[in-house]
C-alpha cells in the first residue's frame, strides 16, 4: 500500500527505513536485504540509499514509498494519489516506474489525473460507493463521459499563460 502521504523517520537512511518497514512486514533479514537491493536499483534510489529520508526531494520520497509498498511483492498494489504534489517531470518518471512495476499485479489506483491512469492501466474500473459503475479502457471511458474530461495540448509558449490563469 502506498498512501498519498506516508510517515517516515526523517533521520533514518533510505536503506534503514526500508529495512525497518521490511521487518514490520515480517520479511526475514536475508530476503529483506535482497528485496531492498532490487527495489533500490529498480526505483533509481540505489545511489541515494545512504541519504537520510529528510534530505530527499518529493519525487525521491515517492520512489521510496513505492519501494516500501513492493517489499513483500504483493499481488495487489494499492496506490492513493501516487503522483500528487510532484512536478511534471517527476510525475512522468513516477508513473512510468509504476507502469513497469505493476505488470502482473492488480493495481487499485485512486487518482484524479487521467494521464496517470493511461500510463499504468490497460483496463479501468470506475467505482462509486464500493460498486463498479463503469469499466473499459481509458479511451473508452473518456469517450463515454463527454463534458467530464478535457484534454488540451499546449506548446511551450502557451503553457506559461495557461498556468498563470490558475494561480491565485
Question: In which residue ranges do the predicted regions lie?
Answer:
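Conserved ABC ATPase signature
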Residues: 52-56
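ABC ATPase "signature
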Residues: 135-136
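Catalytic Walker B motif of ABC-type/P-loop ATPase nucleotide-binding domains
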Residues: 77-80
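Conserved catalytic motifs of ABC-family nucleotide-binding domains
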Residues: 73
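Hydrophobic anchor residue at the start of the ABC signature
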Residues: 66
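Conserved ABC ATPase "signature" region
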Residues: 19, 23, 30-48
Amino acid at each position: 500500500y502506498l498512501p498519498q502521504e506516508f510517515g517516515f523517520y526523517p533521520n533514518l537512511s533510505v536503506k534503514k527505513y526500508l529495512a525497518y518497514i521490511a521487518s514490520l512486514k515480517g520479511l526475514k533479514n536475508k530476503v529483506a536485504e535482497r528485496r531492498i537491493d532490487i527495489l533500490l536499483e529498480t526505483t533509481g534510489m540505489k545511489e541515494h540509499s545512504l541519504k537520510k529520508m529528510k534530505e530527499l526531494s518529493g519525487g525521491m520520497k515517492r520512489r521510496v514509498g513505492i519501494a516500501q509498498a513492493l517489499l513483500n511483492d504483493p499481488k495487489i498494489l494499492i496506490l492513493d494519489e501516487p503522483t500528487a504534489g510532484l512536478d511534471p517531470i517527476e510525475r512522468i518518471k513516477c508513473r512510468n516506474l509504476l507502469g513497469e512495476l505493476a505488470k502482473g499485479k492488480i493495481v487499485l489506483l485512486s487518482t484524479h489525473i487521467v494521464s496517470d491512469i493511461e500510463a499504468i492501466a490497460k483496463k479501468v474500473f470506475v467505482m462509486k460507493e464500493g460498486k463498479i459503475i463503469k469499466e473499459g479502457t481509458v479511451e473508452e471511458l473518456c469517450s463515454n463521459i463527454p463534458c467530464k474530461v478535457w484534454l488540451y495540448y499546449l506548446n511551450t509558449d502557451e503553457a506559461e499563460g495557461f498556468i498563470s490563469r490558475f494561480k491565485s
